């Protein structure tokens, strides 16, 4: 999510999973992680749409938005329904966004263990560039 050429946030949770084709569920609430939120979690109404705003784990910049949104995706994934199609989507995303192991090492400590566990169990880690 961008304002005046500066990245301020990104979609997360079911909203992000649906945008990337990782789920067919359509959320009735959009979740957004943003720099502009001071509370940990806040729910607002925009017209007739419900939006959950979450405070970012770290400052979101043009340089780190891709790795942060990717790690949030990995944190939101359920491994119960993980298949080859989802692996292909995530591998393409890793390559498209240029995500590398140095970025993962830098930002992984900010996320719950589930994000890294999913990254390893899904074998996506093997597709990440050195």
Go through the PLM ranges and name each one.
Residues 1-48:
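Short gly/ser-rich loop at a beta-strand->alpha-helix junction or flexible surface loop bordering the NTP-binding
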Residues 52-130:
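Hydrophobic alpha-helical interaction segments
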